[in-house]
């Protein structure tokens, strides 16, 4: 199990979505609600925060939504990725996404 050497560090899992132009407001809302629900369904998720892009820099490349999940360890993150609820979410979101960007990092206090 990979755990940061500093107990105060947190593993951040960042997921950004770019929706297809055919995705409706209802499709997008369904994705938002379903992603939020993963926090209650998957115990390894310590925190889940999300929002929509408000940057004025115009470098978003069409990505509109960003979700940040916190885990205590890489093992917890891996359990989340393999969890049946996460896999079901992937099937829900896949048809309405044009692209997805994911990055994980150990945050420093």
Summary of predicted features, one role per range:
Residues 68:
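Short, structured active-site "lid" loops
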Residues 1-64, 72-82, 105-109:
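Short S/T/G/P-rich N-terminal loop/turn motif that feeds into the first structured element of a domain
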Residues 36-42, 87-90, 97:
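A common structural junction motif
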Residues 96-102:
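C-terminal partner/receptor-binding element of secreted or periplasmic proteins
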Residues 22, 84-87, 93:
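Generic hydrophobic alpha-helical segments
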């Amino acid at each position: 199990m990979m755990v940061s050497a500093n107990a105060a560090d947190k593993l951040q899992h960042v997921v950004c979505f770019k929706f297809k132009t055919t995705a409706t407001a209802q499709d997008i809302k369904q994705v938002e609600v379903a992603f939020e629900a993963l926090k209650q369904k998957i115990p390894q998720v310590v925190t889940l925060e999300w929002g929509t892009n408000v940057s004025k820099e115009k470098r978003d490349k069409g990505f509109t939504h960003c979700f940040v999940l916190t885990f205590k360890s890489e093992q917890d993150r891996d359990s989340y990725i393999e969890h049946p609820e996460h896999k079901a979410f992937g099937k829900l979101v896949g048809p309405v996404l044009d692209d997805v960007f994911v990055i994980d990092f150990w945050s420093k206090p």
